[in-house]
Curated annotation (Swiss-Prot):
Annotated residues for binding of ATP 2: R707, R746, L748, E752, G777, V778, H779, S780, Q820, E832
Protein name listed in UniProt: Carbamoyl phosphate synthase large chain
Cell division as UniProt keyword: no
Cofactor note: Binds 4 Mg(2+) or Mn(2+) ions per subunit.
Catalytic activity: hydrogencarbonate + L-glutamine + 2 ATP + H2O = carbamoyl phosphate + L-glutamate + 2 ADP + phosphate + 2 H(+)
Binding site for Mn(2+) 2: E298, N300
Ligand binding (Mg(2+) 2): E298, N300
Amino-acid positions noted as binding Mn(2+) 4 in the UniProt annotation, renumbered to this chain: E832, N834
Domain notes: The large subunit is composed of 2 ATP-grasp domains that are involved in binding the 2 ATP molecules needed for carbamoyl phosphate synthesis. The N-terminal ATP-grasp domain (referred to as the carboxyphosphate synthetic component) catalyzes the ATP-dependent phosphorylation of hydrogencarbonate to carboxyphosphate and the subsequent nucleophilic attack by ammonia to form a carbamate intermediate.
UniProt KW Repeat keyword: yes
Length: 1058
C-alpha cells in the first residue's frame, strides 16, 4: 500500500529527559523516525523537553518545540499547529502515556488529530495489565497465575491463594518502575503501595514468580497488510527475575533448540497480529529450561531499548521502517537501507554473536542497593560483536570502563570463596565477575547453575575463558596459543599479565607474528546480498572487509556507555563533530560501543567501528585507517583518558594538545599558569597520603573541597569539615587512583558561574555565560543553570570574558573549553577548567542558536572564527530566559542519598524557556516532573547553620498559602520568630513521626538540609529516602526550594491586611 496522501503534518512526541529505564535509545529512534518521515515528504513537528538530543536539532524536524511533555503544553501546541496526525510509538513510555492522556482529555477529537501506527486500543491492550491478560487467555497463550490489584488489601488476598514469591508489575510504567519481587509480607507492604503510586492508572499486576526461567525476547515488525517478520531474537543470560535492561543479553539466542525457536517465533508473530500493532514491538517470553512450557511476560507496543539493541545488532533500522509503516507503507515496498537491493520484508540474518552488558552507577553510589530484580538500575549499556560468544563477551566487558578488563575483578584474589559464593547468590551488578572468580577457584559450573539458574551453556563458555587463562599461565611465549586466545577475545593487557610481560611487549610480539584483527561488515543478511554498509567489528580471522579509501580521514572517539557524569550530551557533541568533518570534505570515522546512541547509527558517519574504547582496540583501527589525526575533545573522560596513550604511539591529537589537557589537570602547572595570567583561584594544595592531606587542610582552613584529579562528574568529590572526615576520604580516594594526587581546595561559598567558549588558536568566542541557582558546592551537572545570567553586573561579565580569553590563550586551546567560576565577596575565582566539550554544549547550542560543537570542530580543522562569522567576544543575548534543570533517578536506586553536593547524581536534564525567569523555571521544573501547586504543605527539617535562611523561605511559603510542618528543633526556631507551624514527631519515638506524615500523604514538599555525618541511619537520610519512595518532592538545597517559591509567587496573589 503506498504512503498516505491525506495527511501532511505529523506531530512526533519525544521521550523527555534521560532517566534509568529510558535513555538515549529514544533519541536514536526519534531522530531516525523524523528523518524517515521527512524523506517521504511529510512536515514533522517535534516536541521534546530534553535539549541534549539530536532529535531536537532544527535540521531533524520542520518545527521543533522544546517544551514540557505534559497534556497542558502539548494541548497548546496541538491547538496552535493543528497537525493531521500524532505518532506516539517512538518516544518510549512517556509518549505512549501522553497519547492515552491526550485522547482522554478530548483534545485529539477536538482538533481532528489521528493517532498513527499502533492504534490506541492496541496500546491499551498491551499496556493495561488486565486487558493484556484477557487477550492472552483469548489466544490460549499462557501467562503466569496473576491478579490485577488496585489496593494493598486486594494484593494480600491474592497472595493467600497462591503464596510467595510474587512479582509486582505496575501498569503503564517502564524500566520496572515501582515493581519488584515479594518474598514475604514485609516486601508486599513496601512494594505494592509504591507500585500503585507510580502507575498512572493506579493498577498493578501481581503474578506468581517464575524467576529462574529463561528470558527470551523477539523484536517483531508488522504492517497494515498483516505482513509480520522477526527482526532479531535475543536471549538474556540472566534468567527471569532480573529486568531485561539489567541483564546481559546475547543475539541471536544461543541455547534454544530449533523447535523451541520456531515455537516462540510463531507465538510472537501471533501476538503482534492479535494486537494489530503497526510498526515495531518487543515480546518477552519466559521458557522453562526443562520442558517446552512457556509464559508470555509482556509486550511493548513501541520502539524500546531492545529495539535499539536489535537495530545495532542486525543493522536493520527498526525506527526508520516503523515510521514508514505508520504512514501506510508496507514492508514489501520499503527498500532495506542497508543492502539498498532487498526489501524490508526480508528477515535479517547474522553470522556473529552480539553481547550487551548493562552499565550500572554503583561506582558513583557505593552505598546503593546493588541487588538486581524487576526494577531497572542500569544507566546505560555497551555492546560488542564477535565471531564467538567468548570474544563478544570479553570485548563487551572491556567496553564497560569499570577498570575491569576481563572476566574477573582486579582484586579478585583478595576475596574468600565464601564471600564469592555469597555475591553470586545475591544477584548483584558484579555477579558476572564473581562467577569468573568462582571458576578460577574450581567451583563447578553445576554448582554455579544451582545458585544462579544461568544456563550451563553460558557457564561453560565462561569456563572456557578461565581454562584458556590457565593454559596461558603454563605456556608462556607459545605463539599458537597467543593466536588462539586472541580469537576468543583476550586483550593484550590480560595476556601480558599472565605471561608476566608488558602490554607493549605483547603487542609487538603479535605484530611480529602477524596476529592482527580483521574487520567484518554488519550487513543484515550474513553476506547473502551485496551490501556496502560502512559498519564494522573486529575479529581474529583472515579476510578483512574494511578497505581503506584514499580520502583524508579524521577519527572521532565516542564517549562509550551512558553513566552518571558522562551522559548523552557527549554523544550530541560527537555527532555534531562528525557532521562538521564531513562538511569540510574529510572522511569521518567513529569508534564507539554504545548501542543506544545516534553516533553509532551507521548512516551518520562515513565509517563506524563498533569497538571497545581501549588503547589496543583503537590503535589497531588507527594502524589500518592511518588518519590525519584523532579527535578526543567530544568523547568525555573516556576519550581524554586515551589521549596520552595515543600520543605515545605517534598519533596526532587534533585540537587542544595533550600538553593543554595536562596543564589544566595538573595542580602545580595550572597554578603557575593562573599566577602568570593574574587570575585568582581558591587556595589549594595536593596530597598523596593522609598525613600531607591533614597538614594541608589545616593550613587552608576547613571546610575544604577534596577531589581526585582526572575525573568527570565530580566522582569521589566531597566537602569535608574536619580531620576525621578527611582521613576517611583519603583512605577511600587513594584507592580510586594511585597515579594522580588528591586536590584539596578552600571551599568558597558563592555564586557559581559556568562558561563555554570556542577558540581557533588565536581568537576566542563565548556562546554564553550561565549562572547556577545553587551556590558553589553543588555539582554543576546537578545545578539549575540560567541563561543569560540574571544577577551579574556589567563589570563581572567583562571580567569573566577577560579571564576566559586569557585562559583559552594561555592553554593554547583549539576547539572547546569549559570553565567554572565562583563569585565570592565581590571577587571572581576560577574553580575548574576543562579544555574539551562539556555537558552544557547542547543546552547552549539550543538556547543561543550557535552550533557550538560544529563550530569548534571546524576550528580544530583550521577554520578561523572570523571567517565563520564570529567576530565578537560573546554571542548576542535574545529577549528570553532559559533554564536547564537536572533530572534524577533516585526512585530506582534504593539506599542512595538524595542530598546534592559536589559529586554528580543526576541522569538527565530538561529545558524551560520563556520571557522571564519565573515562567522559564515553571516550565523547567514541570518538565523535570515536579508538579507545581499554589498551595499545600511544606515540611522543613533544617540543620542549625541553615535555620536563618530557611526561616525566610518558610515565611515566603506561608505568605502564598502553604501550611508549614516542621520537626521539633526547626519548629521551635521558627516559632520564636512568630511563624505558625505544625510540629511532627521524631523518627521512631512518636505516634505521628515525620516518616508517617510523608507516608500518609500529609506532605507535598520536603525541605531538608543535612547534618554532618555519613551514616545511612541518620534521620535526614531516612526522611529523604522516604520522600523519594513516596514520590514527594524533596529539596536538599535551599536555593532550589527558593527557585520553586519564586515560581509559586509568580502564579499566586498574596493576600494581606492593610
Amino acid at each position: 500500500m503506498p504512503k498516505r496522501k491525506d495527511i501532511k503534518t505529523i506531530l512526533v512526541i519525544g521521550s523527555g529527559p534521560i532517566i534509568i529505564g529510558q535513555a538515549a535509545e529514544f533519541d536514536y529512534a526519534g531522530t531516525q523516525a523524523c528523518l524517515s518521515l521527512r524523506e517521504e515528504g511529510y512536515e514533522v513537528i517535534l516536541v521534546n523537553s530534553n535539549p541534549a538530543t539530536i532529535m531536537t536539532d532544527k535540521e531533524i524536524a520542520d518545527k521543533v518545540y522544546i517544551e514540557p511533555l505534559t497534556v497542558e503544553f502539548l494541548s497548546k501546541i496541538i491547538r496552535k499547529e493543528k497537525p493531521d496526525a500524532l505518532l506516539p510509538t517512538l518516544g518510549g513510555q512517556v509518549a505512549l502515556n501522553l497519547a492515552v492522556s491526550l485522547h482522554e482529555s478530548g483534545i485529539l477529537d477536538e482538533c481532528g488529530v489521528e493517532i498513527l501506527g499502533t492504534k490506541l486500543t492496541s496500546i491499551k491492550q498491551a499496556e493495561d495489565r488486565e486487558l493484556f491478560r484477557d487477550l492472552m487467555n483469548e489466544l490460549n497463550e499462557p501467562v503466569p497465575d496473576s491478579a490485577i490489584v488496585h489496593t494493598l488489601e486486594e494484593a494480600e488476598n491474592f497472595v493467600k491463594e497462591i503464596d510467595y514469591p510474587v512479582i509486582v508489575r505496575p501498569a503503564f510504567t517502564m524500566g520496572g518502575t515501582g515493581g519488584g519481587i515479594c518474598y514475604n509480607e514485609e516486601d508486599l507492604h513496601e512494594i505494592v503501595p509504591n507500585g500503585l503510586n507510580y502507575s498512572p492508572v493506579h493498577q498493578c499486576l501481581l503474578e506468581k514468580s517464575i524467576a529462574g526461567y529463561k528470558e527470551i525476547e523477539y523484536e517483531v515488525m508488522r504492517d497494515s497488510n498483516d505482513t509480520a517478520i522477526v527482526v532479531c531474537n535475543m536471549e538474556n543470560i540472566d534468567p527471569v527475575g532480573i529486568h531485561t535492561g539489567d541483564s546481559i543479553v546475547v543475539a541471536p539466542s544461543q541455547t534454544l533448540t530449533d523447535r523451541e525457536h520456531h515455537m516462540l517465533r510463531d507465538v510472537s508473530l501471533k501476538i503482534i497480529r492479535a494486537l494489530k500493532i503497526e510498526g515495531g514491538c518487543n515480546v518477552q517470553i519466559a521458557l522453562d529450561p526443562n520442558s517446552f512450557k512457556y509464559y508470555i511476560i509482556e509486550v511493548n507496543p513501541r520502539v524500546s531499548r531492545s529495539s535499539a539493541l536489535a537495530s545495532k545488532a542486525t543493522g536493520y533500522p527498526i525506527a526508520k521502517i516503523a515510521a514508514k509503516i505508520a504512514v501506510g507503507m508496507t514492508l514489501d515496498e520499503i527498500i532495506n537501507p542497508v543492502t539498498k537491493s532487498s526489501y524490508a520484508c526480508f528477515e535479517p540474518a547474522i553470522d556473529y554473536v552480539v553481547t550487551k552488558i548493562p552499565r550500572f552507577p554503583f561506582d558513583k553510589f557505593g552505598d546503593g542497593d546493588r541487588y538486581l530484580g524487576t526494577q531497572m538500575k542500569a544507566t546505560g549499556e555497551v555492546m560488542a560483536i564477535g565471531r564467538t560468544l567468548e570474544e563478544s563477551l570479553l570485548k563487551a566487558i572491556r567496553s564497560l570502563e569499570y577498570g575491569v578488563h576481563h572476566l574477573g575483578l582486579p582484586n579478585g584474589e583478595e576475596f574468600s570463596l565464601e564471600k564469592i559464593i555469597k555475591r553470586i547468590k545475591l544477584a548483584g551488578d558484579e555477579r558476572l565477575f564473581f562467577i569468573g572468580e568462582a571458576l578460577r577457584r574450581d567451583v563447578s559450573i553445576e554448582e554455579i547453575h544451582e545458585y544462579t539458574k544461568i544456563d550451563l551453556f553460558f557457564l561453560n563458555k565462561m569456563k572456557n575463558i578461565i581454562d584458556l587463562e590457565h593454559l596461558l599461565k603454563d605456556n608462556k611465549g607459545n605463539i599458537e596459543l597467543l593466536r588462539k586466545v586472541k580469537t576468543f577475545g583476550f586483550s593484550d593487557r590480560v595476556i601480558a599479565h599472565r605471561w608476566e610481560m608488558t602490554e607493549p611487549e605483547i603487542t609487538e610480539l603479535r605484530h611480529k607474528h602477524n596476529i592482527r584483527p580483521v574487520y567484518k561488515m554488519v550487513d543484515t543478511c550474513a553476506a547473502e546480498f551485496d551490501s556496502n554498509t560502512p559498519y564494522f567489528y573486529s575479529t581474529y580471522e583472515f579476510e578483512n572487509e574494511s578497505t581503506r579509501s584514499d580520502k583524508e580521514k579524521i577519527v572521532v572517539l565516542g564517549s562509550g556507555p551512558i553513566r552518571i557524569g558522562q551522559g548523552i550530551e557527549f554523544d550530541y557533541a560527537t555527532v555534531h563533530a562528525i557532521m562538521a568533518i564531513k562538511k569540510l570534505g574529510y572522511e569521518a570515522i567513529v569508534i564507539n560501543n554504545n548501542p543506544e546512541t545516534v553516533s553509532t547509527d551507521f548512516s551518520i558517519s562515513d565509517k563506524l567501528y563498533f569497538e571497545p574504547l581501549t588503547q589496543e582496540d583503537v590503535m589497531e583501527i588507527l594502524d589500518l585507517e592511518k588518519p590525519l589525526g584523532v579527535v578526543v575533545q567530544f568523547g568525555g573522560q573516556t576519550a581524554i583518558n586515551l589521549a596520552d596513550k595515543l600520543v605515545k604511539n605517534g598519533i596526532q591529537i587534533l585540537g587542544s594538545s595533550l600538553d593543554s589537557i595536562d596543564t589544566a589537570e595538573d595542580r602545580d602547572r595550572f597554578e603557575k599558569l593562573l599566577i602568570g595570567l593574574k587570575i585568582p583561584q581558591p587556595l589549594g594544595k595536593t596530597a598523596f597520603d593522609v598525613e600531607t592531606a591533614l597538614k594541608n587542610a589545616n593550613e587552608i582552613g576547613y571546610p575544604v573541597l577534596v577531589r581526585p584529579s582526572y575525573v568527570l562528574g565530580g566522582r569521589a568529590m566531597e566537602i569535608v569539615y574536619n580531620d576525621e572526615d578527611l582521613t576517611k576520604y583519603m583512605e577511600k580516594a587513594v584507592h580510586i587512583n594511585p597515579d594522580h594526587p588528591v586536590l584539596i581546595d578552600r571551599y568558597l561559598i558563592g555564586k557559581e558561574i559556568e562558561v563555554d567558549a570556542i577558540s581557533d588558536g588565536e581568537n576566542t568566542f563565548i556562546p554564553g555565560i550561565m549562572e547556577h541557582i545553587e551556590r558553589a558546592g553543588v555539582h554543576s551537572g546537578d545545578s539549575i543553570s540560567i541563561y543569560p545570567p540574571q544577577s551579574l553586573s556589567e563589570k563581572e561579565i567583562e571580567t569573566l570574558i577577560d579571564y576566559t580569553k586569557k585562559l583559552a590563550s594561555g592553554l593554547e586551546v583549539k576547539g572547546l573549553i569549559n570553565i567554572q567560576y565562583v563569585v565570592s565577596k565581590g571577587e571572581i575565582y576560577v574553580l575548574e577548567v576543562n579544555p574539551r566539550a562539556s555537558r552544557t554544549v547542547p543546552f547552549l547550542s539550543k538556547v543561543t542558536g550557535v552550533p557550538v560543537a560544529n563550530i569548534a570542530m571546524q576550528c580544530i580543522l583550521g577554520k578561523k572564527l572570523k571567517d565563520l562569522g564570529f567576530t565578537k567576544d560573546i554571542a548576542d543575548i535574545g529577549n528570553f530566559v532559559s533554564v536547564k534543570v537536572p533530572v534524577f533517578s533516585f526512585q530506582k536506586l534504593k539506599n542512595v542519598d538524595t542530598t546534592l553536593g559536589p559529586e554528580m547524581k543526576s541522569t538527565g536534564e530538561v529545558i524551560g524557556t520563556d520571557v522571564n525567569l519565573q515562567k522559564a523555571l515553571y516550565k523547567g521544573l514541570t518538565a523535570a516532573g515536579i508538579k507545581i501547586k499554589d498551595y499545600g504543605r511544606v515540611l522543613f527539617t533544617i540543620d542549625d547553620k541553615n535555620k536563618e535562611a530557611a526561616l525566610n523561605l518558610a515565611k515566603g511559603f506561608s505568605d502564598v498559602g502553604f501550611s508549614i510542618l516542621t520537626t521539633e528543633g526547626t519548629g521551635i526556631y521558627f516559632e520564636e520568630y512568630g511563624l505558625k507551624v505544625k510540629k511532627v514527631g521524631k523518627i521512631d519515638n512518636s505516634d505521628y513521626s515525620v516518616l508517617d506524615a510523608i507516608q500518609n500523604g500529609d506532605v507535598d514538599i520536603v525541605i531538608n538540609t543535612t547534618t554532618k555525618g555519613k551514616s545511612s541511619e541518620k534521620d535526614g537520610f531516612r526522611i529523604r529516602r522516604k520522600a523519594t519512595e513516596y514520590g514527594v518532592i524533596c529539596f536538599t538545597s535551599l536555593d532550589t526550594a527558593n527557585a520553586l517559591l519564586r515560581v509559586i509567587e509568580s502564579m499566586s496573589f498574596r493576600v494581606q491586611t492593610l
